[in-house]
Amino acid sequence: MKKNVEIKKLGINGEGIGYIDRKIVFVPGALPQEEVIVEIIKQTRTYSEGKLLQVVKPSKDRVTPKCRSYDNCQGCTMLHLSYFKQLNAKKEAVRESIRKYTEYDLSRTIFKDVIAAPSQEGFITAVNLPIVDFKGKISFGIYQRDSKYLTLMTRCFKQHPIINECLLKLEEILTTNKCKTYSDKFRTGLRFLKVKLIDNKLQLVFITGRDWLKEEIVKEISQLPHVASIFMSVNTSKHQEFDELGYSKLYGATRLELHDDKNQYLVSVKSKLPENIEMMWKQNQTIKSSVQDSQKIISLNCGIGLLELNLDQEIVAIDEKRYQIDDAKLNAK
């Protein structure tokens, strides 16, 4: 069933919101002030979902996404909206979430503008990707929600170029060596790849079945540019909490060094880093300026102490993961 819909606002997940016969309809890919033609693909008693077929009257804020897979990939939801309008939308999403899910009085809070990122391209420095078989080639990609569509992640414009270059080289090495992707039946093969880029050095973690990675393949990977360490973990369970079983080091440094203007931090294979390191430093400076009048601070989910070690006050730092605390203690020395 096709319908004309006028989009009134954005939802908290970036989808356009309009109304048909006073019932709300969610339209991914549509923007406020747009008139669109949609196909209704789902109806419930309280709402409908529409697939965007045509933009009859486009918004002045609509832009052409740089991602070549944007129409099918669901990893990003607002690339068709100009960047600074995205920031406004994110601020409103926070306000709307607080209004909808809490009893907090919004009139008591001033919502400041979202701080823009230094770069909108090449900023992702940590990725976790399934290892997939695509047209007879080993690659790295993600399957989209509620579909069998595969998005290859070897050329994602948001990922740092060093990561993309490494993924392409790994494709070549793993395919040439006739590696296999994971088989639930036999519990063998390559399952996941975790990559961290820290000060232009790569930490690679392979999650495999019972057959591990061959020594000659590890040696070939170790010779790639920027590769500083390689780890592996055998995991044949259904869940994806790989940290619990630990990792075996196959090559290189046990910990990598991360630097800011004043300090050096050690990062182990288990420790988590934000995907946008540049933005994290900016965030830390904002938080530091906001707590200047505080004498004692409790920090929950402190990680390895990247924020806490830059604060001047007395800090009580808490994290549920022991390995995060171990790294934080090393960094505090």
Locations of regions flagged by a protein language model:
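Terminal RNA-binding accessory module
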Residues: 1-69, 100-105
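Rossmann-like S-adenosyl-L-methionine
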Residues: 3, 9-12, 16, 212-333
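Short, conserved phosphate/pyrophosphate- and ester-handling motifs at nucleotide-, phospho-/glycolipid
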Residues: 33, 159, 276
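Hydrophobic beta-strand signal
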Residues: 37-39, 128, 298
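A short glycine-rich, hydrophobically flanked beta-strand micro-motif that places a catalytic Asp/Glu
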Residues: 182-197
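Short, aliphatic-rich beta-strand segments
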Residues: 195-209, 264-268
